[in-house]
């Protein structure tokens, strides 16, 4: 056995960093959502954005609901003041309901989908800004790397699927 062999990358004593994978998956999800939202007027593109956007909203909103539950109804140490609530927002469940209503109704995406997706992305970006402040020291790099690009991609896709209308005055 060589001295220091246990400290080599990949050994059982040194866990491999998964941060790159979280970032890659977040960028992939966000990129696909942004792309699919732009194709929402093109037949299958609408269905792709509805399915993928609804799935992302359900997953992120479900994670947010779980964190709110843990924060409100348990004494779990790590659930209290969990900044990841800005990343996995319970508002995702509301967005899921709006997406389901859009799927049933058909037609162009409602403005409420765009507005709520952008709101969720702004909260997510606010979580990044909070990390720069000395009062917030939670180690949540993995959550930031996954949720921020995915939430921004969802907002971009929703904005492309439901563009703001400019009415003449």
Protein language model features and the residues they cover:
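Long, repeat-rich segments with strong aromatic
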Residues: 24, 51-58
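Selective detector of the "anchor" transmembrane alpha-helix that sits immediately C-terminal
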Residues: 13-42, 90
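Generic detector of multi-pass transmembrane helix bundles and their immediately adjacent loops
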Residues: 38, 43, 55-169
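Soluble extramembrane regions of membrane proteins in the secretory/endomembrane system
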Residues: 1-11
């Amino acid at each position: 056995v060589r001295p220091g062999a246990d400290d080599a990358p990949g050994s059982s004593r040194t866990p491999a960093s998964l941060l790159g994978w979280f970032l890659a998956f977040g960028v992939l999800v966000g990129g696909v959502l942004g792309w699919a939202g732009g194709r929402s007027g093109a037949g299958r593109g609408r269905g792709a954005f509805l399915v993928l956007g609804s799935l992302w909203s359900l997953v992120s909103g479900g994670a947010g609901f779980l964190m709110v539950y843990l924060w409100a109804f348990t004494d779990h140490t790590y659930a209290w003041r969990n900044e990841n609530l800005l990343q996995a927002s319970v508002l995702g469940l509301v967005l899921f309901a709006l997406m389901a209503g859009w799927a049933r109704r058909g037609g162009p995406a409602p403005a409420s989908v765009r507005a709520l997706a952008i709101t969720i992305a702004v909260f997510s970006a606010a979580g990044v800004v909070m990390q720069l402040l000395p009062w917030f020291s939670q180690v949540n790099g993995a959550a930031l790397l996954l949720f921020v690009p995915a939430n921004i991609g969802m907002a971009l896709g929703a904005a492309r699927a439901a563009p703001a209308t400019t009415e003449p005055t």
